[in-house]
Swiss-Prot record:
Any Gene Ontology CC annotation: nucleosome
InterPro entries from the UniProt entry: Histone-fold (IPR009072), Histone_H2A (IPR002119), Histone_H2A/H2B/H3 (IPR007125), Histone_H2A_C (IPR032454), Histone_H2A_CS (IPR032458)
Chain segments carrying region Disordered: 1-31, 133-159
Lineage of origin: Eukaryota, Viridiplantae, Streptophyta, Embryophyta, Tracheophyta
Chief site of localization: nucleus
Protein name: Histone H2A
Described function: Core component of nucleosome. Nucleosomes wrap and compact DNA into chromatin, limiting DNA accessibility to the cellular machineries which require DNA as a template. Histones thereby play a central role in transcription regulation, DNA repair, DNA replication and chromosomal stability. DNA accessibility is regulated via a complex set of post-translational modifications of histones, also called histone code, and nucleosome remodeling.
Gene3D superfamilies, A to Z: Histone, subunit A (1.10.20.10)
The UniProt record lists the keyword DNA-binding: yes
Domain notes: Contains 2 SPKK motifs which may interact with the minor groove of A/T-rich DNA sites. Phosphorylation of this motif may regulate DNA binding. This motif is reiterated in both termini of histone H1 and in the N-terminus of sea urchin histones H2B, but its presence in the C-terminus seems to be unique to plant H2A.
Length: 159
């Protein structure tokens, strides 16, 4: 073999990744782009390895996990956006995220034990505490002499 690196086989000197030295470098494509995802597949793979969840991590595991996380994030954001629009707001705040999660049956079950900071609570009034509708009001059909709720609630006591 001479100093140029060409030996008996007649092959030229190899550079990184098996390409010929001096040739055009191929543009790298991330695994997120290959999978059609927005979430970072490489970073999730690094976290899986670093976290020591298992001895070895398969090549498909970070892709699958990134896809699942992206789907969940999109679902929560869509519902939170709807909650913001219902409240005539253009910016999603933690309150909207909480309303979105707690009003959705499956997300509420998944994130049941999660506390969202500055989310507040769901509006809920026990039906027992609501004012009772009287039979007189229902039969009158909306007469002009409608009693106020305080007067309707107070009825003469019978001994």
């Amino acid at each position: 073999m001479d100093s140029t690196g060409t030996g008996a086989g007649g092959k030229g000197k190899k550079g990184a990744a098996g390409r010929k030295v001096g040739g055009p470098r191929k543009k790298s494509v991330s695994r997120s782009v290959k999978a059609g995802l927005q979430f970072p597949v490489g970073r999730i793979g690094r976290y899986l390895k670093k976290g020591r969840y298992a001895q070895x991590v398969g090549t498909g595991a970070p892709v699958y996990l990134a896809a699942v996380l992206e789907y969940l994030a999109a679902e929560v954001l869509e519902l939170a956006g709807n909650a913001a629009r219902d409240n005539k707001k253009t910016r999603i705040i933690p309150r909207h995220v909480l309303l979105a999660i707690r009003n959705d049956e499956e997300l509420g079950k998944l994130l049941g034990g999660v506390t969202i900071a500055h989310g507040g609570v769901l509006p809920n009034i026990n039906p027992v505490l609501l004012p009772k509708k009287t039979a007189e009001k229902a039969s009158s059909g909306g007469s002009k002499e409608a009693k106020s709720p305080k007067k309707a609630a107070k009825s003469p006591k019978k001994a």
